[in-house]
Amino acid sequence: MSYFEHIPAIRYEGPQSDNPLAYHHYDPDKRVLGKTLAEHLRIAVCYWHTFVWPGHDIFGQGAFQRPWQQPGDALERARQKADAAFEFFTKLGTPFYTFHDTDVAPEGDSLRDYAANFARMVDYLGERQHASGVRLLWGTANLFSHPRFAAGAATNPNPDVFAWAATQVCHALDATHRLGGENYVLWGGREGYETLLNTDLKRERDQFARFLSMVVEHKHRIGFKGALLIEPKPQEPTKHQYDYDVATVHGFLVQYGLQNEIRVNIEANHATLAGHSFHHEIANAFALGVFGSVDANRGDPQNGWDTDQFPNSVEELTLAFYEILRHGGFTTGGMNFDAKVRRQSIDPEDLFYGHVGAIDVLALALERAAVLVENDRLDALRRQRYAQWDDAFGRKILSGGYTLESLAADALARGVNPRHASGAQERLENIVNQAIYGLR
């Protein structure tokens, strides 16, 4: 059975085409900086927003009528969902996908049900991967939707909830390994608090760290070679989450000695909620040595919640890709579309329109970022700004050649009177615009 029989395979037709079901800028085989666009972008489609979300919101019930979401045998519906998903991936031409455990398999009424159902669906996903050539970018466990996780999973006051969560992660990590996944993501959607009046912050942080340490140990025990990634988010669904942003996650990892084991998966909309730009979070991740992967989407700056819209800003993504490219590009990570169509977009074609347009935006942004990397104008000005630190005096400070007292004495003896230099922000912004809009 075909779920998208009236929709052709999406092909590159070029910028002059007016076909809404074609790529206008994404030519997967086009080479940029020595790699194809497909190799650079490593695009993934997420299971949850695309095939699981029924189109509901807090004010209304599901608006979609997906065949695989209708009442019936839960495992049969899960197989239909997988069939629809892999038909979608294949027609879109995207090389990767991502999932939560309970996206792909019914949870059932017990842990035994969960394990049995998930095992059956992992077998089925393996068959679909083999037949299609589509690969798993990352897997994860849903430790936030069920009421048992209302007070958190790893940070829950009940150790039985901790144990249930550990069981899910154990199975999800095993499944990711078996399916050839390149990363495993840990998003602590409920790892936070609603009120400090009933919260022991130190205890919950210690519990979370213990949980992560167990995941790290299991990764090595089973021989999983992929990366473990935490996905930062400041709030929603909790008032305050412990993985607030990249810097917070890094500090947490350092505190518990996990900084060499876990990196970050950065979502654009989560950066918005944390009061940061997407560019900031990616640059910070590289500066701290924890960059892993990206969830590509956008938020609405007028809304204080996670809208998970498809990315549509070449300007925003150019700066994000500039950081990624100048640091060598993705290794195990990629661009996962953690994005959903709007509730009124009920037609099957809308799923394609959203992804096709966003993929074109990624391609445009990456090519513009490549211009910035190739012409080296931004980096040259940055190097010039800090050039004095590469002189003998600057190197001596950084290498420990001075104490605070001896440096002060040296400054007094030389009569230091430094002059302020221009930051040249306007010039730098012009360089970016020239690259984005094709001026040079």
From Swiss-Prot:
EC number: 5.3.1.5
Places the protein is found: Cytoplasm
Cofactor: Mg(2+)
Entry binding sites for Mg(2+) 2: E267, H270, D306, D308
Active site annotation, chain numbering: H100, D103
Any one GO cellular component localisation term in the record: cytoplasm
Enzyme class label: isomerase
Residues in coiled coil: none
Amino-acid positions noted as binding Mg(2+) 1 in the UniProt annotation, renumbered to this chain: E231, E267, D295, D338
SUPFAM superfamilies xrefs: Xylose isomerase-like
Keywords, sorted A to Z: Carbohydrate metabolism, Cytoplasm, Isomerase, Magnesium, Metal-binding, Xylose metabolism
A single MF term (Gene Ontology): magnesium ion binding
Catalytic activity: alpha-D-xylose = alpha-D-xylulofuranose
PANTHER family membership: PTHR48408, XYLOSE ISOMERASE
Stated family: Belongs to the xylose isomerase family.
Subunit structure: Homotetramer.
The name this protein goes by in its record: Xylose isomerase
Organism name: Burkholderia orbicola (strain MC0-3)
